[in-house]
Amino acid sequence: MGLNTAIATRVNGTPPPEVPIADIELGSLDFWALDDDVRDGAFATLRREAPISFWPTIELPGFVAGNGHWALTKYDDVFYASRHPDIFSSYPNITINDQTPELAEYFGSMIVLDDPRHQRLRSIVSRAFTPKVVARIEAAVRDRAHRLVSSMIANNPDRQADLVSELAGPLPLQIICDMMGIPKADHQRIFHWTNVILGFGDPDLATDFDEFMQVSADIGAYATALAEDRRVNHHDDLTSSLVEAEVDGERLSSREIASFFILLVVAGNETTRNAITHGVLALSRYPEQRDRWWSDFDGLAPTAVEEIVRWASPVVYMRRTLTQDIELRGTKMAAGDKVSLWYCSANRDESKFADPWTFDLARNPNPHLGFGGGGAHFCLGANLARREIRVAFDELRRQMPDVVATEEPARLLSQFIHGIKTLPVTWS
């Protein structure tokens, strides 16, 4: 390649190190500070030796930990739970900590509801994310990506930059802000707010619960103000759709609009950002895969995008709550128990994927659960995310084809999001 990089290339397909079960601590934030390889090795051990196991909830300041949770680590179990919302309910929360009234004020959106109300709420915005509509905004996505990569080159004559702040972060943020009708002048504020909300617990981002609640209040107030404007000034945007929609014969309340808004801007920003970043990191580690893709970009793009999402698994887990007693793999779990669905583990399950440790851009079939396990809560923005990922890599291929990570990434300290805070890159 000829470019200086401290990223060690690897033999593609190398399994992670063995991790003894006694060393695994899903209920400790220290475990989530470990390298990805160790984490992958830990989940491989759990799939093999304890596919369903019980863990305490991580204690985060201000949050109510509540009871521990049953961790499902095998693909088939995660898939089953995703497809049986009558047993594995999204209510009252999708993270392992307990929902409190003050948190529900801002995070009580459709993602923590079950059908039929979940489906009625989802239908308000789902039209904006269909393949046909996403195809219509392709030109806008490409224009944004082209400008961001061009600016990255123009603003960094030394040909060194942080991929996250210059491309992977701004691209999905700008697109979802455009769709919501958020003015450009406010994009950076939205970016900061979403970082605090999903990065809480990471010392670089936020560990003060009062700050977390203030940011939640700020974004809620912003959403309410934007919605009030749309009540009198209709725009062709998602905020207007929320304001004008009726569910069960009633308009959404300001609180419902605010929590819906928070869900869309947070989910529409963070997950795609991390998929793009993990993708560039993987192409840096396995340069033969990049050469293969660049030589047939359009031909490989559909499978390449799916493999990047499998590899990244941007959302690490989702929680469900049992509505009845159930027995899985000989493990008895009771109504009211918390159950965690570990997508990161399911996407490396040796019983489901041939060579799961191989980053293979031509992988087919690839039934990954990177957008969730299907069913009612399948990722609403999956079509948009796929488009953004594809376009981002196409622009990199066109403008800086030899882009490579120069250092290991700064990883987000989080049990919930497989995040990267910074990834230094260079190009020739």
Curated annotation (Swiss-Prot):
Its EC number is 1.14.15.14, 1.14.15.28. It comes from the Bacteria. Coiled coil: none annotated. InterPro entries: Cyt_P450, Cyt_P450_B, Cyt_P450_sf. It holds the Pfam family p450. Its cofactor is heme. It is an enzyme of class 1 (oxidoreductase). The keyword Coiled coil does not apply. CDD domains: CYP142-like. It catalyses: a methyl-branched lipid + O2 + 2 reduced ferredoxin [iron-sulfur] cluster + 2 H(+) = an omega-hydroxy-methyl-branched lipid + H2O + 2 oxidized ferredoxin [iron-sulfur] cluster; cholest-4-en-3-one + 6 reduced [2Fe-2S]-[ferredoxin] + 3 O2 + 5 H(+) = (25R)-3-oxocholest-4-en-26-oate + 6 oxidized [2Fe-2S]-[ferredoxin] + 4 H2O; 15-methylhexadecanoate + NADPH + O2 + H(+) = omega-hydroxy-15-methyl-hexadecanoate + NADP(+) + H2O; 3,7,11,15-tetramethylhexadecanoate + NADPH + O2 + H(+) = omega-hydroxy-3,7,11,15-tetramethyl-hexadecanoate + NADP(+) + H2O. Primarily hydroxylates the omega-carbon of a number of methyl-branched lipids, including (2E,6E)-farnesol, phytanate, geranylgeraniol, 15-methylpalmitate and (2E,6E)-farnesyl diphosphate. Also catalyzes the sequential oxidation of the terminal methyl of cholest-4-en-3-one into (25R)-26-hydroxycholest-4-en-3-one (alcohol), (25R)-26-oxocholest-4-en-3-one (aldehyde), to finally yield the carboxylic acid (25R)-3-oxocholest-4-en-26-oate. Cyp124 catalyzes preferentially the oxidation of (25R)-26-hydroxycholest-4-en-3-one diastereomer. Belongs to the cytochrome P450 family. This is Methyl-branched lipid omega-hydroxylase. It comes from Mycobacterium tuberculosis (strain ATCC 25618 / H37Rv). The gene is cyp124.
